[in-house]
Amino acid sequence: MAKRSNIYAGVAGYVGRPEEKGNVGVFRRAAADAAWQHVLTDLETHALLVHPTDPEVVFAGTVDGVWRSTDRGATFQRARFPDQGKQIWSFLVDARDPRRIYAGASPVDIYRSDDRGESWRRLPNPGIKDRATAPFAVRVMRMVQHPTRPDELYAALEVNGVMRSGDAGETWTDCSADLIRLSERPNLRSKIVSDTYAEGMLDGHAIAISAGDPDAVVLACRMGLFRSTDRGQSWQDMEMHKFSPVTYGRDVRASPQDASTLYAALSVAAASTDGGVYRSQDAGKTWKRFDKVQVHGTIMSVGLHPTDPDQVYIGARYKGEVFGTQDGGATWEAMPLPEPVKDIYAVACG
């Protein structure tokens, strides 16, 4: 197991549910310690990043831009970020240059730093047409970089499908037409907050690419997991119902160490009391239940250690539940956040 590994949880309020002051932000605990520390207070936090080459540097995506720590999360300072009050929902480190980091925002914008997150600039707006209405602005929920074409980026949008860039984020192309076509199938129709039954397919939460199958882009959305092998022109249902009784896809991540391993967080719905983490060791062809715990809320996030494959952590909504394994899934430990903290959105470790 990697030494001096910290665990981080990002907490925010659920849409339409007021939160009490002090119950949001970033919590930190050492992997061998039972106590959580509230290290960033008052700012709702939807995304976390432990820098993969320097774990001293930790990023929090908040409702007021990017906050940065250079002491393993003991303290945070607001980065030199160009916009006030901008919600940050995702981060991506460029595999070619660890100094370059992307941040995805709501309303949709992409920001980039070329100095390890000290300062940021807003890239040209992607200009993707909104295809569904929602009680919130569209969010850039996750970004991923192609393993062998590093200028090729993909982003999962909530609620607006997928977009692709071929020039390191300067311009973007809509990749959602086939997701909308798939929504014509009875089992893939879903409408909760908008006037289109394509809403469920456009409800993108996460996106990943495994190095073992670099031309397969995997999307986690409300209707399950979907796969594209032609840069987002077409999508195929990965039929997660064959492997899991619940199929609401909230997170999908590729292992940093194993080229063929993927992890997916599946639950019943955005607001639910059950869920599980599934692992594929063949680049998404087959899946098996990985965790050995009972959650009481939707699993919102899977946190993978940058260098230690045995460490995996999950965070579930509503009861401040964090669970972790440090032995590759053989045993699991409950690590609940202090009450009344509830709505976990992100977990990370390193």
Indicate residue ranges for each PLM-predicted region.
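Extracellular glycan-interacting surfaces
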Residues: 1-350
